[in-house]
Structures are given as structure tokens and as C-alpha cells.
């Protein structure tokens, strides 16, 4: 039977691990969103360039 201190240590380690995983997952989600934003911005610029060049000819 674990003592109170051991239970507290297990709880603390579990909580710390879950917070670390949530932080890593949040960073992943943020980086994916930023990547998609830059992809979208590049596509918008290319579309504007194509529209600009097709308007000249």
C-alpha cells in the first residue's frame, strides 16, 4: 500500500506529464495552423500574380 507521499508523487508526476503532453500538442497545432496560413497566403499571391499577368495580355 503506497504512502500518502508516494501517492502525492505519483499524482504530481501524472499531472506534470499530462501538462507537458498538452503543451507539446498545443505547439503542434499552432505550427500546423501557421503552416496552413502561409500556404494560403502563397496561393493568394500566386492567384493575384496570375490575374495581373493575364490582364496585361
From Swiss-Prot:
Residues 1-14 are mitochondrial intermembrane. GO terms for biological process: mitochondrial cytochrome c oxidase assembly. It is found in: Mitochondrion outer membrane. It is a single-pass membrane protein. Residues 38-57 are cytoplasmic. GO terms for cellular component: mitochondrial inner membrane; mitochondrial outer membrane; mitochondrion. Its main location: mitochondrion. Disulfide bonds: none annotated. Keywords: Disease variant, Membrane, Mitochondrion, Mitochondrion outer membrane, Primary mitochondrial disease, Transmembrane, Transmembrane helix. The chain crosses the membrane at residues 15-37. Core component of the MITRAC (mitochondrial translation regulation assembly intermediate of cytochrome c oxidase complex) complex, that regulates cytochrome c oxidase assembly. Requires for coordination of the early steps of cytochrome c oxidase assembly with the synthesis of MT-CO1. Along with COA3, core component of the MITRAC (mitochondrial translation regulation assembly intermediate of cytochrome c oxidase complex) complex. It is linked to Mitochondrial complex IV deficiency, nuclear type 10: An autosomal recessive mitochondrial disorder that manifests with neonatal neurological and respiratory distress. Clinical features include facial dysmorphism, hypotelorism, microphthalmia, an ogival palate, and severe metabolic acidosis. Death occurs in early infancy. Autoptic examination reveals brain hypertrophy, diffuse alteration of white matter myelination, numerous cavities in the parieto-occipital region, brainstem and cerebellum, as well as hepatomegaly, hypertrophic cardiomyopathy, renal hypoplasia, and adrenal hyperplasia. This is Cytochrome c oxidase assembly protein COX14. It comes from Homo sapiens.
Amino acid at each position: 500500500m503506497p504512502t500518502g507521499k508516494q501517492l502525492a508523487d505519483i499524482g504530481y508526476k501524472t499531472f506534470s506529464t499530462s501538462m507537458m503532453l498538452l503543451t507539446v500538442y498545443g505547439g503542434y497545432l499552432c505550427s500546423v495552423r501557421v503552416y496552413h496560413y502561409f500556404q494560403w497566403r502563397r496561393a493568394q499571391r500566386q492567384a493575384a500574380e496570375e490575374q495581373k499577368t493575364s490582364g496585361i495580355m
